[in-house]
Every structure is written in structure tokens, then in C-alpha cells.
Amino acid sequence: MANTNTKKKSAALSGQEIPTLNIKAENIIFISDIHFGWASSSEEWQENQERYFNEWFIPYIQKTLAERPETVVVSLGDVYHDRKSIDIDVNELCIDTFERIANIIPCYIINGNHDLSKKTNKGNSSLRSLTNIKNLTVIKEPTLMKFKSGTKVLASIAAIPYLGDCNDENKWLVEFSGKAEYALMHTDISKMKFDNGMTIVGAVDAEKFSGRVISGHIHKRQETPKVVYVGSPYQMSRGDIGNQKGIYLLTLEDGELIFTPNNFSPVFQKLDIKQFMNMTDVERREKLNGNYTDIVIDEADVPNYKMADIYELMNTSGAKRAQLEVKKSKIDVSDDEDGRSTDEKTVEELIDQAIESLEGVDEQTIAELKALSSQYLSAAREAEDQK
């Protein structure tokens, strides 16, 4: 099993010492954005998360250790969801879960923004409740992790927790560039996508780092040659529809990043009413059982169906939650320049269109307005999904 010892290394950036962790391990399992306490700490979501860890993630760890003994787990932030208060049952679930994990494998956690009381890493952290767990290390400041096999250094990895300032995070990327092959972060990264699909601008610049960046924070899993957003381990809202969740394993000897899909946890999905009604009982239960499903019906088609029949089929499907979504009929709409009518565009596209039509505004301001709009809509969606 991997083990760790700590020493200090001087840092040109801070004038202080950069913590350095020497870790005997050849592989890293990445998980991120667990968000214990999601959906207002509902019992339903506590059950979802408990089952995920007990029935999928921990068995995955055990299987991996059987094949690759020198492996550790790294969580890339947002272990908890609520910055202000944590439900007692949620806290117990989190502690119990990480005690189980750390009992079988070394575990490292970097601060995410939801783990902090303030919007920087200067405040208190909810991760303090995990610091007394044996075999678990919480990383609260930029740290160099050196992974070794015997005396051979397989990889040097920079761990940069959420700092609350992309300028500071950029400086640390520059500091670690050339000294580490990977940077582990929890942040917004320019040119990647927010969960709502909007492009991130004015954030951390991954090009300042010579290696590859692996980050938490954005829930939608994304990969480019330069950046990997690990994403949340399971779908958490409608914004995750179509985004395959799972776990990454990095093999340090050859730099291979292996993705294992999570086909265990509930998913969010939308079904057209005709598709839903034409399914057999067996097909319907297979599709909806344990999942969150919106059944979409056009407003004009409502009179063609008996609502009682639809609700009866939904209620007997075994779904975690199934609800009817009435889609407004299209009325007197005009086509835009791209050939799509206004009601065919997303809210984000319509706002972008309005921003781009502003007169006397430079490109940088337009980009910043789009970024602010995107962040607001992401927060609004998250709040809506937790109702």
C-alpha cells in the first residue's frame, strides 16, 4: 500500500516553503465534486450517494487495488455542498464514507470552493471534520506531490486547491511549470465549458502550465489534450443529461488516463410522450426505474391524452421521480439570421444575442458580460434543481 512522508521545498513565488509530499504510488484514482448535502440534504440524495460509494466506488477501488496495489485516491474538491451549515446526518455519512475509503487506500483531498466558509482559501474548511482520519490527507495550500516507485520518481504533480482568485492560481501554474507534469486544481479554466455549455473566459489559463491540468469544479465531464474536467461522479441535475459520468485512473508509469463509466447511479433524462406511451411495461420500467425523468408533451397534444393514464404509468415505473413537462406551442415566431426561430433557441443563446447587439461595447467587455451571464444561469439552474 502507498505511504507518504512530508518535507519542505523553497518557493520562489511565495518566499515561503512549498509543502512537498513524497508518495509511494504508481496510480491515482480521481474523484471530484461529491457534494455531500446536495438537494438541501435530502434523504433521497443521501441514499443515492451512500449506495454509490458502498455498491460502486468502493468495489471499484477494491478491484483496482487487486490489479494495481500501489494506488491512491485523490478527491479534487467539493466534498461537501453547503458552505454555511452541514446536516448532522450528512456529516456522519461523509465521515463514515471516507473512513471506509481511507481504511483500504491512501486518500488525498484538495479544498474546493464549497468546502470553504469564504470565497477564498483563507477561511474555515468543512474538510476539518476529515483531518483526523488515518491514511487521509487534506491539502489546503499549493503543494508538490512526488510519486515514487522505490527510489524512482514517476511523476511530480502540483496540487493547487481553490484559492478564489484566478490570478493567484495562474501564478502558481507558472511557478510549477517545468517542475511538475500534472496540475490538480478546482477552478474555472478558460476555453473550457461551464455546465450550461457556455465557454469559460477570463479564468485560469492552462497554457501557463507546461503539463496537463486535471481539475474539479465543473460538473460536466470534459477532455481536451491540455485539460481534463473529471466532472461529478454521478448525474446531479438536468444539466447533466447526456453527460457520461465515471472515474479516472492515471497510470504514472506511462501517463495513460483510463475512464471507467458509472452506469450504476440514477440519471436525468427526457422522453417524448409518444415514446413513453409506446413502450411496453417492461421497457418503461427498464428506462425509468431508479432515474429522474421528464415526460415532454406539446401543449397542443394535451387534449389527446388522458392525464390520469400518464400519471398512472409514471407512478408504476419505479422512477426516482417522473414528471410531466408541457412544452408551449409555437405561435407566430420569426426566424433569426441563423434560420432558427426565437423559441428554438436556449436562454443562453438569446442572452448572448442581446449582449452582442450592444453598441459601443468592446470585445473584452462583451466576453465578460457573457461570462457573468453564464455564471448566473448556472447558479439559477442549480438552485432550481435542488427545489
Where are the language model's segments positioned?
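Accessory, non-catalytic peripheral segments of nucleic-acid enzymes
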Residues: A2-K24, A66-E67, L252-K387
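Core catalytic region of metal-dependent phosphoesterases/phosphodiesterases
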Residues: G15, N22, E26-N27, S41-L144
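Active-site neighborhood of phospho(di)ester-bond hydrolases with catalytic His/Asp-centered motifs
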Residues: F30-S32, V72-D78, P106-N113, T137-P142, ...
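Active-site environment of divalent metal-dependent phosphoester hydrolases
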Residues: H35-A39, H81-K84, I110-N124, M145, ...
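Short, conserved loop/helix-junction motifs that constitute active-site signature segments
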Residues: E99-N103, V174-S177, A203-F209, G242, ...
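Conserved catalytic scaffold of divalent metal-dependent phosphoesterases
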Residues: D115-V204, P233
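Active-site regions of enzymes building and remodeling cell-envelope glycoconjugates
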Residues: N135-L136, E181-A183, P225-G231, Y311-A322
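Conserved beta-sheet core of the metallophosphoesterase superfamily
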Residues: D195-T260
